[in-house]
Amino acid sequence: MLSAPFSTVARALNRRGLGRLRNLEPKPPVQRYERERPGDLIHIDVKKLARFRKVGHRITGNRQQGRSAGVGYDRVHVAINDARRLAYVEVLPDEQQGTAIGFLSRALAWFNSQGVECAQVMSDNGPAYISKAFTKACSVLKLKHIRTRPYTPRTNGKAERFIQTLCKEWAYAMPFQNSQERNVWLPRYLSIYNRLRKHSALSGRSPQQRLHELLC
């Protein structure tokens, strides 16, 4: 038996992030998987990136000189193919349901132009993705919508890892003078990523090389 009052113990657990039962349970091991066909599943997600008018503190090392106050954020919407890591990305002003639906439609059209017909889409439980409008759009597009379990973003790990790569190799890769210049470089980076960048999960091939092997 504990000598301290229950309320004291509860506060101590809360301070350590252990106030909820699920935080005390061991996390299950990550179930890694990969769909066989290139169109079986695409993962979608959104990354918020700050806009800026001058070179930021990540480059200058000075938060005061590198600050661009009041310019807001861009939302980087990503869609990545599960089997071959082929990626489609747009920088958009928000992540509202209409914006998310428009992005999904254009992403599907682009994947179709690459010879990939998508059957399923996986997302997290963001407000846009759980909306009735998004559910209806998936039905119209003949997509099965799979949502990750609450509080388990690693379920959508391929999108999460691609966003990390995108930030490292594009968004924070060089001292862009402003966010508009950063965004202009995105199509160039995506071309390199899809056509030329070797991927360890694809045995050293690029996404388009692996897709070409599969479709031929």
State what each model feature region is.
Residues E95, Q114-S131, R149-Y151, S203-Q208:
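Acidic/histidine-rich, metal-coordinating catalytic segments
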Residues M1-K54, P127, T135-K136, R149-P153, ...:
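Basic, flexible linker segments flanking DNA-binding modules
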Residues G66-S68, G72-Y73, E90-Q114:
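Active-site beta-loop-alpha junctions of metal-dependent nucleic acid enzymes
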Residues V46, D82, D94, N125:
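Residues immediately flanking
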Residues G39-D40, K132, S139-L143, T165-C216:
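C-terminal domain-tail junction helix/linker
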Residues R11, G102, V184:
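DNA-binding alpha-helical recognition surfaces that contact promoter or target DNA
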Residues G19-I80, L86, G102, E117:
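Mobile-element integrase/transposase regions
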Residues Q120-N125, S139-K158, M174-S179:
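RNase H-like polynucleotidyl transferase catalytic core
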